[in-house]
Amino acid sequence: MTNIRKTHPLMKILNDAFIDLPTPSNISSWWNFGSLLGLCLITQILTGLFLAMHYTPDTSTAFSSVAHICRDVNYGWFIRYLHANGASMFFICLYAHIGRGLYYGSYMFQETWNIGVLLLLTVMATAFVGYVLPWGQMSFWGATVITNLLSAIPYIGTTLVEWIWGGFSVDKATLTRFFAFHFILPFIITALVIVHLLFLHETGSNNPTGIPSNMDMIPFHPYHTFKDILGALLLILVLLTLTLFTPDLLGDPDNYTPANPLSTPAHIKPEWYFLFAYAILRSIPNKLGGVLALLLSILILIFIPMLQTSKQRSMMFRPFSQLLFWTLIADLLTLTWIGSQPVEHPYIIVGQLASILYFLLILVLMPTVSLIENKLLKW
């Protein structure tokens, strides 16, 4: 008799996705981040749901409702810090996942890659509106500064900003709608994740060599399920260590001051995972130019498959491309550091050089070096 998991309409879907899925035998731990992102998403939705039960999206009570969660709700402090640090873990996994895709040429699965870029944008939007909810100083001023960027759009900019605000400044209407967005977006993300997996399972996984591995596949379960469990345990270990020992390590002290429209913080900056884009935004003296550079710094990912000039898919056997890849990582870390610094000498010029290098590496140097590698291999 055929096993029920292969015949039942619902279990068949799960079976084909997580149990009998043919998987390359040589995929490394860099392939763990997809499942870790799924774990992060589930954690964020669950902790977020419990936080939403006690939170009030109103300017007069939002800050005190978060304080109430931390002080009076059973393990409320734990749920709140799990949610805040869970967002950081989410972005660490997200950036590692994208980095893996860039290094091993996974972007050649174009539909999967494009849905992935869309997912990145949606997660970024969710994190941004979520940061506004505690209604601390950095929440308020972060929302004001970032939404104000839309006023750089010619002709309709100001109207657009006021439409998003629901008034003439960030106020009650803004907080209420941001809470609504923050609640609905994770479910949209979940739907996109399913589409992302659907497209991935059309082609099958890539592997470190970038060479088709149809002749060497193993079932996903038990091999990769156990490998994923190890990754999950490490993720949980890091998240719990962060949450229980240094819950405020990645946060901003300014957010422990209630929002005050009459007092601007000395240094307005977003959470660490947006700092690289914030540095690129600040490095251009023109407002519209800065906004375009900010958008392009993320949307450039869409153009990566078109910039593939190498005859090889993966960077595994391309030392020059590897050098440029790690230069790009170092550049992004530099931009992240610059984004956290005040706008003064020497940070301004370092930020501008790092921003130029970021676009230069992706648009010019990497495609050129790939062509040189082809020539060296006489391809």
Swiss-Prot record:
Positions binding heme b b562 in this chain are 83, 182
**Which cofactors go with this protein?**
heme b
The source's domain of life comes to Eukaryota
Report the record's Gene Ontology biological process terms: mitochondrial electron transport, ubiquinol to cytochrome c
Q: Which residues bind heme b b566?
A: 97, 196
The membrane topology noted for this protein in its Swiss-Prot or TrEMBL record is:
Multi-pass membrane protein
Please share the entry's free-text remark on the cofactor.
Answer: Binds 2 heme b groups non-covalently.
Disulphides: none
| Stretches that traverse the bilayer | 33-53, 77-98, 113-133, 178-198, 226-246, 288-308, 320-340, 347-367
The record's section on PANTHER family has:
CYTOCHROME B
The UniProt family comment states: Belongs to the cytochrome b family.
Give the protein's function: Component of the ubiquinol-cytochrome c reductase complex (complex III or cytochrome b-c1 complex) that is part of the mitochondrial respiratory chain. The b-c1 complex mediates electron transfer from ubiquinol to cytochrome c. Contributes to the generation of a proton gradient across the mitochondrial membrane that is then used for ATP synthesis.
What is the recorded name of this protein?
Answer: Cytochrome b
Q: What gene makes this protein?
A: MT-CYB
